[in-house]
Regions:
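Positively charged, polar, low-complexity stretches
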Residues: 2-85
Length: 85
């Protein structure tokens, strides 16, 4: 049975808590969630570490995203991705 992603849309910008996603599919789930963003729309990712490998993957995408660190550790990193192109 499919599980819903741990996505909170209580705020004006949806948040995805990736800690709750199995590690094996985490990056794929994040890329899928980012694919739903139109130009000008944002999403916040909550990660258990600084996701540098993920940031490199996102930089290589056809779509472009502005990246803003909202919180940097020690237990969680909150990063806002805003689609720019």
């Amino acid at each position: 049975m499919p599980r819903d992603l741990p996505l909170s849309n209580n705020a004006s910008i949806p948040e995805l808590d990736v800690v709750q996603i199995p590690h094996e599919i985490r990056h794929g789930a994040i890329h899928g969630a980012l694919s739903t963003r139109d130009i000008g729309q944002a999403m916040i990712i909550i990660a258990p570490h600084n996701p540098l490998p993920l940031l490199r993957e996102i930089a290589a995408r056809e779509e472009e995203f502005a990246v803003e660190y909202l919180n940097e550790g020690p237990d969680a990193w909150r990063i806002q991705f805003t689609r720019t192109a």
